[in-house]
From Swiss-Prot:
Displays a superantigen activity in human and mouse, activating mostly V-beta-8 subtypes of T-cell receptor. Disulfide bonds: none annotated. Keywords: Capsid protein, Helical capsid protein, Host cytoplasm, Phosphoprotein, Ribonucleoprotein, RNA-binding, Superantigen, Viral nucleoprotein, Virion. The gene is N. This is Nucleoprotein. InterPro entries: Rhabdo_ncapsid (IPR000448), Rhabdovirus_ncapsid_C (IPR023331), Rhabdovirus_ncapsid_N (IPR023330), Rhabdovirus_nucleoprotein-like (IPR035961). Phosphorylated by host CK2. Unphosphorylated protein N seems to have a better affinity for leader viral promoter encapsidation. Phosphorylation of protein N in ribonucleocapsid may stabilize the interaction with protein P, thereby playing an important role in viral transcription/replication. It is found in: Virion; Host cytoplasm.
Amino acid sequence: MDADKIVFKVNNQVVSLKPEIIVDQYEYKYPAIKDLKKPSITLGKAPDLNKAYKSVLSGLNAAKLDPDDVCSYLAAAMQFFEGTCPEDWTSYGILIARKGDKITPDSLVEIKRTGVEGNWALTGGMELTRDPTVPEHASLVGLLLSLYRLSKISGQNTGNYKTNIADRIEQIFETAPFIKIVEHHTLMTTHKMCANWSTIPNFRFLAGTYDMFFSRIEHLYSAIRVGTVVTAYEDCSGLVSFTGFIKQINLTAREAILYFFHKNFEEEIRRMFEPGQETAVPHSYFIHFRSLGLSGKSPYSSNAVGHVFNLIHFVGCYMGQVRSLNATVIAACAPHEMSVLGGYLGEEFFGKGTFERRFFRDEKELQEYETAELTKTDAALADDGTVNSDDEDYFSGETRSPEAVYARIMMNGGRLKRSHIRRYVSVSSNHQARPNSFAEFLNKTYTSDS
């Protein structure tokens, strides 16, 4: 018997077939570099930096930026940001720099140049007559890279969120060591003319390169990261959420995964912990793999590990975390089942802790405590395990163990308890729910049951 087939009759004729549905056609690509070559892009001819500065600044003022010219300028301006490498820097077997080396952002990558001239038009009226200073170059680089951050802010953010961010960024780049080079609100006005620039591969690459550099190298102009920080772990919301989750519940990754009681987690956990990746290596190319073009479709995004993502944020909702209530539900990844498991895990880790004495007045007190604890352990091991109290949680031993939680779920038939539903409704009803958020899902799903 083929387990995938169904049998039925059509006009008295027996039909046997295998139902097939549309599947995810995209290949998840891991970012490991196997050819020992630095990530690279190709740009037009390197410009005269003074001419390029004047052209790009005039375009910023006129809200008419040429993306090719901007990228060419950003790559050329990397020479202004020299710093000292604090330690030997390697990633995926590539030696980026030795300890003590003088490096600039373009030491991290390979930027190839063609002979094609840029436009370098002056679209913003008056031309700057003198040559720009380094602080002026740094301010222009910072403002241009901030267009990346602004273009990554989703439309779901309410009110004047994006405008407020743009205003704060402008304030940074008009304060020493930077210098004011544009009028107030210029950044937001220009952003509206290039709102999708985060999708331009070369611009994204340069933003990631600057961010990777300034995240490691101490530098006078490190505040440039304000516009590029969103390239770190970009499209890794699944992995980032899991990392935050295990810190929140104070377990190791291995201990936390033992609570994932659902077959749909198997493929996602395998995908998320593929061997050979530098997920735990500081300052690795891995952190910026998306912007550096090392992977077309991230295996670590919320969509790639949707069941894990949903579970983590249902637990977060149970604990009243605003970030989880605002996160977007992955509708195709069993949100109803994940909300049930999330309720049980939320109850398990909410308002409870495992505590023990760790600090003592002197060594004598420490030894006395350890002796007393050993005596308790010996007594527990000698116990025959007979259940003699209604308060015991189904069996003797660690009630917070995966076995204990699984037993409670089974005893309740895989359904949420009333107390779980009340908690879900309580946290979600007091929150202004965004469309398709976890708060909205919980409100719509459980309000009538509370």
